[in-house]
């Protein structure tokens, strides 16, 4: 390779490196309001998934984001209904793929007519639907929940959460996400969702690409919301290691830093409920033998 060609390749490499760094670090300002009936709501946490800011007394917020944010979203405050879109809680808005330097995003909430201080939380986990013939069972379970709430908890607001593994095999049946949303909506209560290992895209090159399908239906994989005096936090503790179906339990540093900021907004002494797919405690940690399963969330759990 002659010196002239080597110099040209070096310059090209340098220019591409500079472009890549600029694409990551150039700030984008996301701004707007959190409103109810045209009036701003104060002290609502707004996040890009990395940093959290609070709305001012007029409901205004501004985030200078350098994190390649996918969403701008809020911590749903108590006293307002859960906004729904496509039968999924709509506390988030997806940002443009190539945002301008300033992006305007507003959120509109409606006041709740019920007191959430006493409420019901329905928890499901691992429905793992693989086949068409299993869907009627989910529909029946939803009807059972609806009947139970009407019989035993009439007049008490109710919410639900699915703690991961919504479908069985995303590689063969990613289309099951949509009918699962429809089936669960038959409970007629708002349901939140947690990502599980069965909900990951597996034929991808890295963990960063493993949530594309899931996010297209449910949005952010970690977030929080308030109902009554309880602060609910949903975390994503699945890390795909880009080999077959293998994964480990792991909370990213970005997510932990977000969680620290989130919890700073919670009144000390409040009840905090954390939902994630892989448990924070496992007897595997007591085993002396080192194995694949021993890799799961035994370190990051200590920081919760």
Where in this protein do the model-derived segments appear?
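Extended active-site neighborhood of metal-dependent phosphoesterases/phosphodiesterases
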Residues: 78-83, 91-94, 172-260, 264-268
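Beta-strand-rich domain onsets/edges
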Residues: 18-29
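Short, ordered, surface-exposed loop/turn motifs in non-cytosolic proteins
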Residues: 28-31, 36-50, 67-68
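A short, solvent-exposed beta-strand micro-motif common in secreted/extracellular proteins
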Residues: 68-85
């Amino acid at each position: 390779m002659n010196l002239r060609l080597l110099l040209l390749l070096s310059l090209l490499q340098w220019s591409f490196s500079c472009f890549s760094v600029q694409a990551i670090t150039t700030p984008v300002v996301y701004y707007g309001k959190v409103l109810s009936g045209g009036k701003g709501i104060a002290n609502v946490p707004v996040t890009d998934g990395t940093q959290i800011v609070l709305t001012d007394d007029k409901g205004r917020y501004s985030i200078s984001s350098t994190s390649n944010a996918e969403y701008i979203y809020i911590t749903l405050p108590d006293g307002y209904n859960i906004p729904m879109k496509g039968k999924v809680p709509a506390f988030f808005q997806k940002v443009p793929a190539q945002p301008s330097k300033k992006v305007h995003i507003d959120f509109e909430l409606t006041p709740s007519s019920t007191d959430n201080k006493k409420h019901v939380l329905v928890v499901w986990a691992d429905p793992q639907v693989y086949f068409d013939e299993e869907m009627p069972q989910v529909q029946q379970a939803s009807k059972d929940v609806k009947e139970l709430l009407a019989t035993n908890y009439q007049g008490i607001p109710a919410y639900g959460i699915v703690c991961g593994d919504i479908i069985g095999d995303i590689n063969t049946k990613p289309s099951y996400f949509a009918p699962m949303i429809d089936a669960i909506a038959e409970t007629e209560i708002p349901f939140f969702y947690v990502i599980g290992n069965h909900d990951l895209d597996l034929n991808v090159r890295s963990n960063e690409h493993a949530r594309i399908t899931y996010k297209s239906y449910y949005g952010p994989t970690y977030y929080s919301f308030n109902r009554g005096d309880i602060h609910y936090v949903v975390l994503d503790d699945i890390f795909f290691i880009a080999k077959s179906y293998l994964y480990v339990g792991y909370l990213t540093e970005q997510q932990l830093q977000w969680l620290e900021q989130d919890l700073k907004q919670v009144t000390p002494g409040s009840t905090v409920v954390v939902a994630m797919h892989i448990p924070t405690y496992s007897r595997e940690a007591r085993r002396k033998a080192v194995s694949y399963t021993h890799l799961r969330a035994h370190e990051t759990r200590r920081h919760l």
